[in-house]
């Protein structure tokens, strides 16, 4: 058993390093998400203010503060690097993986099954995609996984002291989740445990000990909640009504999508384990009486999934918390299939992975060969990127083939399918995507002008955050567009941060007396710089959809 634990620990550590650590600093930051979170934490560290989030020097109330603390600490430890920007997400994903292992050991006392569950979790497409991307979803997923483990401890406790301890841990997890992403962290655990409470007849325990969790969560959140209410009295009004009610429930909710939206998303999210999905969910339902731990996991998968499906606003990242319990279900289902000599599901899984790799290879060949004249993703000079992409998906295909042979023993090799993709994807991104969604490249190419400009403006918040991050300045101004900082711009002390196109000529005449001025525009598809009604610039640089208008200082 010790040898098993040691070999699995080494395997998981190597996998984690290859997928989650090594690629981090080699990829440019995506806008708007990564540039936003990078800059918010940089400004918090610069200001020494860990209570009120700011973006571009403006109040930014879209999220509470605990998720930023992860990123703050990462930047404090590792400096102003892309690795530091993403490490908060990686750390959270790693801790969630440890919780997956711990819960598996609590349920089954089986190190192999616990290790398999951890490997399945870490190799899921949604997990490694979001777990190496700077957003707050990995942090909230960590706290929801902690809430899941805590609640399981309350079910297994046989004494009042044990139950009390479990509910205290549940309150701590929910409190930190609330401080990371708001009331969602309170709603999801409540929804997830309802079927479990009914099935196991735990209503009395919930009524007795549930208030303990609520009190602990409130006590944990209260110092910051009071501090921000004192400094910014409108925070809670905006955060509750705009960020929760409008985003999820109202007809004008952000990211509206139909009820069935998460069906195809979930199928893609669990790759390279798609064939295990139906059987694992059915197993959790069919064996709900004989094996209540499987129904426990099923409830933590399906109830949040239904909740997010009902909500009008939807994004793929929202279902990340469902992946941890789903990985545990899949591990249990797969091991039972091996024990019962049912290998068909592993053959199907290998075939699905092989088809996925092959389809992606063919898609890259078609895109690179010019067979689709109306689709210009890569230029003729970017053939090395196409080759890199083909190699990445050839790795997916290769490990699919490996896993199909003697699949009762090698089925878990499917976890290696994404390895080359994770290591190489940063080198295969088309230049037009780089110049649209990865502004660091554009900024570095034009650093001579941007770095010496007294004023820097842009019409995109994501690009503005990238400029602020690269230039280490929070006074980047918005040009004619408010975007997601519209609320912060409404404050009287922030109105000078927005320059309209009609005011720009007059403003520019005054600004050039103080120094150079740089205006960065993100052009729409098909839009040219000739369509911009701007004062004549001393220098214009265009890289696909990003354009720099540089105005030299005038006396």
Curated annotation (Swiss-Prot):
GO terms for molecular function: 4-amino-4-deoxy-L-arabinose transferase activity; mannosyltransferase activity. It catalyses: 4-amino-4-deoxy-alpha-L-arabinopyranosyl di-trans,octa-cis-undecaprenyl phosphate + lipid IVA = lipid IIA + di-trans,octa-cis-undecaprenyl phosphate. The keyword Glycosyltransferase applies. Keywords: Cell inner membrane, Cell membrane, Glycosyltransferase, Lipid A biosynthesis, Lipid biosynthesis, Lipid metabolism, Lipopolysaccharide biosynthesis, Membrane, Transferase, Transmembrane, Transmembrane helix. Pathway: Lipopolysaccharide metabolism; 4-amino-4-deoxy-beta-L-arabinose-lipid A biosynthesis. The chain crosses the membrane at residues 6-26, 87-107, 116-136, 178-198, 206-226, 257-277, 293-313, 315-335, 351-371, 384-404, 411-431. The keyword Transferase applies. It is found in: Cell inner membrane. Its main location: membrane. GO terms for biological process: lipid A biosynthetic process; lipopolysaccharide biosynthetic process; protein O-linked glycosylation; response to iron(III) ion. Its EC number is 2.4.2.43. It is a multi-pass membrane protein. GO terms for cellular component: plasma membrane. Catalyzes the transfer of the L-Ara4N moiety of the glycolipid undecaprenyl phosphate-alpha-L-Ara4N to lipid A. The modified arabinose is attached to lipid A and is required for resistance to polymyxin and cationic antimicrobial peptides. Belongs to the glycosyltransferase 83 family. This is Undecaprenyl phosphate-alpha-4-amino-4-deoxy-L-arabinose arabinosyl transferase.
